[in-house]
Amino acid sequence: MKYIFLFLTSFVFAQQTQSVDFEIANGQLFVNPKDKTIAGTVTYLFDVLRPIDTIKIDAQNMQFSDVKLNDKPVSFTTNGKQLLLIHPFKKGKKWVQFSYEAKPKQTLYFIGSEANANLQIWTQGQGKYTSHWFPSFDDVNEKVVFNLEIVFDKNYQVIANGTLKEKITNGNNTYWRYRMQKPMSSYLLMMAIGKFDKKTQQSNSGVSLEWYYEPKDAAFFEPTYRHSEAIFNFLEKEIGVKYPWGNYKQVPVRDFLYAGMENTSATTFSSRYVVDAVGFNDRKYTNVNAHELAHQWFGDLVTAESSKHHWLQEGFATYYALLAEKELYGEDYFYSYLYEKAQQLKFASRTDTIPVLNAKASSLTFYEKGAWALFVLHQKIGDKAFKKAIKNYLKKHAFQTVNTNDFFVEIEKVAAFDTKLFSKVWLEDYKFNTLEANDLLKKNTAIKVQLELDQLRNTPLAEKKDFLMKVLQSDVYYTVKESVIFQLRKESYDDIKELLALAMATKNWSIRQKIANLFPKVPEAFKVDYETMLTDASYQTQEIALFQLWNSFENDRIRYLDQTKNWIGFNDYNLRVLWLALALNTPNYNADAAALSKELIQYSSLDFEASTRQNALESLIGFQIIKPEVLHNLVNATTHHLWQFSKFGRDNIRKLLKDPKYRTTFEELLPVLNENEKSQLNRLLVEK
């Protein structure tokens, strides 16, 4: 997963795993989108390893009935967090069956609605706990073979872990029966329901690859899933261990919590990565795609036993994703990425004093410093030894949990390498070893130029201008040329116009995007060249360019609006939202202001994803188009499951409440709000 979480492992549960081994879970589930509830029947097969009088299954706020042990009623109780089976359990194989109901406040999400024909239902177990929607185990050390049968409206597709063994339609419902062969931790359990189509490919090793998409996004399929098959084939070969889960599926879902999630055999990812050919430049799914796939080995096959060793998942997935991108985009890309992350880590270590081997480490540390540590190790012991150690490590600990020492044992078997010193420097020290990092980075010619350029940051322009021009005229990797632009930020246009002409002439959309952000207002002398960025193959560049030109040249606003009136942009409508806001704030623009205002407000409503809504609300508030409907949509934002959007709503309401006019409007909204909205707004109204 692309954002960090913490495993919370209790001592009590650690004791249980020594006494009981849960082996197989069979569940039949019924999901009710109207009530946002889930119900089902679950059977667990387990082995009592030594006598125990209470067995616990994590179950958050669930109601249970028909609880039976080996087909006979058994005493049980619940405490709001667990189902407790009370019985003098003796050694041997047993099974427990029960029915349950729940209305989860998290981990099971209902997006859209059947009425609007845009319903999606999906789960997210990591960092949230699967035990909110399926009675299971919050402790990652308990690994189970999960088999789900999900019953839902026949007009929808249902995706879950494992292989679809049977699909039976009975009346208005379809029974989807998924089966797994190997055990996994509960946080990797998933289901996704929606109206999806799919295309299937086959890997070089014969694994079925299923890529899902919404029918409306059929034209976006190729750029969205670009390189997916190649990434799979590369990682399977590079890792040296056959993909362990039978088949592999990917499905984009709306308003997802993260960039992606590596559920076993079934990755869910954010619909923001559903892009067309232009959108691919700014929002390519490639890195997330490779990262989540790498987790199928590093995280799903072998799982860190506790959060202290979380780098064994995120650091490894980050590094192997980078190796996959190196295969696709070349060594310059690879070293440029490592250089960029080295700069971030060096800067972060000024205030972040928590090392990799610590449960409280930051995402940057777990992911990027973990990846850097692997890069150093890979370079030090050589490719052959590194691959052998990885292969042995995965095979030895397959379907188990691991710690860092387990990995080091395999390193020491293949190389005379001091893992203790390596650990002290790269995993136990919060500081970033810049000297060692730079020595490795200098193997790349582009980074040599980059490091030389870095030495000139505080050098007056006149003294370095010739060197900067040579860099821009060379065939060095484009990120180095972007660093030239970075050094021009505080210079006047007249002093840098020759450099800008060279940079613009590269026709590299990314370099030109850095130029688009260079000036608070576009210089008159740069206007004609700057206008060419309106046609660059980047929706992000176009967004910057349109606003900057509109803001800089008042007399040309209508011309710019006419030129861009059919723009849409990404699937969050970034260009359309900006265009509407600018059109509404351009006097004498020949357009139906009421219709434009209605459209912009609509983008802030429940009909759209959080990213679109936030874009629209920012424009509406920023340009003072603040109607009661806008404020209602802002209040609704505070109830959203995406914490960033919810915080955006709260922060903006707090600002608006300082104006008595808006405070009155908010108070007048209270009678028409639902209970959740009302609760959130009342809390803000009484804040001091």
Which ranges hold each PLM region?
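Alpha-helical scaffold elements that line and support the substrate/ligand-binding pocket
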Residues: 293-303, 317, 369-387
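Acidic/His-enriched low-complexity segments
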Residues: 14-242
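Soluble non-cytosolic domains of exported or imported proteins
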Residues: 218-229, 279-284, 288, 307, ...
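Long, helix-rich interaction regions
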Residues: 9-10, 507-511, 529-688
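Juxtacatalytic substrate-recognition/specificity segment
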Residues: 78, 118-121, 129-130, 148, ...
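Bacterial Sec-dependent N-terminal signal peptides
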Residues: 1-19
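Beta/coil-rich, acidic/histidine-enriched accessory regions frequently appended to metallopeptidases
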Residues: 401-557, 661, 677-688
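Acidic/His/Gly-enriched intrinsically disordered linker/tail segments
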Residues: 308-372, 379-380, 397, 414, ...
